[in-house]
Amino acid sequence: MTGSVWAIVPAAGRGTRFGGAVPKQYLHAAGQPLMAYTLAALAAHPAVAGIVVAIAPDDADWPGWTAVHAKPVLTCVGGATRAASVLAGLLALPDGVRADDFVLVHDAARPNLALADLDRLLEIGRGDPVGAILAAPVRDTLKRAGDDGGIDGTEPRERLWRALTPQLFRRHQLIRGLTEASAAGVDVTDEAMAIERLGLRPLLVEGAEDNFKVTTPADLARFEFELANRDRGGASREAERSAMPSAATSVFSGARSAASGSEEV
């Protein structure tokens, strides 16, 4: 299936695991905020028409980007939860986005998305009536813990997958799923959960294990290590990420450079 899609990035959260005042999506790696890599990875795909970023109402860290790779970047005020921020983003999409159009949702702090994974998700997901998510099969042995910290059992892993992002769904179905979950007091932890509550079955599209979410200092160090290897030409997927920003060059416009403080053009 051809045609363009818009992406939504919920970025109103203020994770506390790092212990600092700066939300994790704005922490720097190689001179750029994590979210710069996230947005650049999305906008690098030719099918992505633009991005809506849901930010906190008092967000003083948002760099004011208006475009990336010449794709428009819009903002809206997010909510107190991820689901509320995604819903706000869905409602803030431009007038030309129709109810049955597919929309991507991607974590702000998941900066290591490969173009090949996004391409495969769009190809498979847009060929399905419901949509699809990137996911990774569980490869570790899973233990069920008891209240005392002991092992109560071993869980079969053969049909278990870890949900990743982006996730791809039709706009009207995701609005309905998130709205109904909120009305029922259900805290959905990803968009697929909201779709599942409607009785729909999204597809699982296997994605790379290194499409990880940065939630701890160790995750940030891992991403910085991968960036360093990429700069030395040692990353196997370097060519896929040639459109990523760096401290010396930016693909953004409408904001000050994270590296130099100069105005982007």
From Swiss-Prot:
Entry superkingdom: Bacteria
Keyword Oxidoreductase: no
GO molecular function annotations of the record: 2-C-methyl-D-erythritol 4-phosphate cytidylyltransferase activity
CDD domains reported for this sequence: CDP-ME_synthetase
Residue spans of biased composition, Basic and acidic residues class: 231-241
GO biological process, one term: isopentenyl diphosphate biosynthetic process, methylerythritol 4-phosphate pathway
Pathway assignment: Isoprenoid biosynthesis; isopentenyl diphosphate biosynthesis via DXP pathway; isopentenyl diphosphate from 1-deoxy-D-xylulose 5-phosphate: step 2/6
Residues with site note (Positions MEP for the nucleophilic attack): R157, K213
Start and end residues of each stretch annotated as Disordered: 231-265
Site (Transition state stabilizer): R17, K24
Keywords associated with the record: Isoprene biosynthesis, Nucleotidyltransferase, Transferase
Low complexity: bias regions: 253-265
PROSITE patterns according to UniProt: ISPD
Keyword Transmembrane: no
Catalytic reaction list: 2-C-methyl-D-erythritol 4-phosphate + CTP + H(+) = 4-CDP-2-C-methyl-D-erythritol + diphosphate
Top-level class of the enzyme under EC nomenclature: transferase
Enzyme Commission numbers on file: 2.7.7.60
NCBIfam families, A to Z: ispD
Similarity field: Belongs to the IspD/TarI cytidylyltransferase family. IspD subfamily.
Role noted for this protein: Catalyzes the formation of 4-diphosphocytidyl-2-C-methyl-D-erythritol from CTP and 2-C-methyl-D-erythritol 4-phosphate (MEP).
Name of this protein: 2-C-methyl-D-erythritol 4-phosphate cytidylyltransferase
Organism in which the protein naturally occurs: Xanthomonas campestris pv. campestris (strain ATCC 33913 / DSM 3586 / NCPPB 528 / LMG 568 / P 25)
Gene this protein is translated from: ispD
